[in-house]
Structures are given as structure tokens and as C-alpha cells.
Amino acid sequence: MIYKVFFQASTTEVPVREHTDSLYVEAVSERDVRDKLKKHSYNIEFIQPVDGAFLDYERESENFKVLEL
């Protein structure tokens, strides 16, 4: 399954909504996503499963790229 991860790039700064970025990760569970991103210094805000019509919509975006971790 593909998950959309909303995160802040720095764990040392206070999270600000306007600075939230997102990325896509293929994993078997939310815990697997967190394990795969553990080595990165992301402040993870939310992990959302993406499937069905939502996945089709996200694929149309020019920013859609699933990370190979």
C-alpha cells in the first residue's frame, strides 16, 4: 500500500502548517513507514493511506513520486 506522509523537515523547530511537506512511501503498515523514515530527521505529523480514487487523483499530480526505501 502507498502512504502519504506529512512532515516538517526539521525536528528542532516548532511545526508550522505552512512549512509542511509531503512524500509518498510504499509500505505494508503505518509502523513500516515510520521504520523506513526513522533514519531521516523528519518530524512526522500524519501518515495517511492512499488507495482507490484518492490514489488515482494523487498520481495525476506532478509531485507524485513514491520513494524507494
From Swiss-Prot:
Superkingdom of origin: Bacteria
Pfam families associated with the record: RpoY
Alphabetical list of Gene3D superfamilies matching this protein: RNAP, epsilon subunit-like (3.10.20.730)
Enzyme class: transferase
BP terms from Gene Ontology: DNA-templated transcription
Catalysed reactions, semicolon-separated: RNA(n) + a ribonucleoside 5'-triphosphate = RNA(n+1) + diphosphate
Assembly information from the UniProt record: RNAP is composed of a core of 2 alpha, a beta and a beta' subunit. The core is associated with a delta subunit, and at least one of epsilon or omega. When a sigma factor is associated with the core the holoenzyme is formed, which can initiate transcription.
Family: Belongs to the RNA polymerase subunit epsilon family.
Designated name of the protein: DNA-directed RNA polymerase subunit epsilon
Species in which this protein is naturally found: Bacillus pumilus (strain SAFR-032)
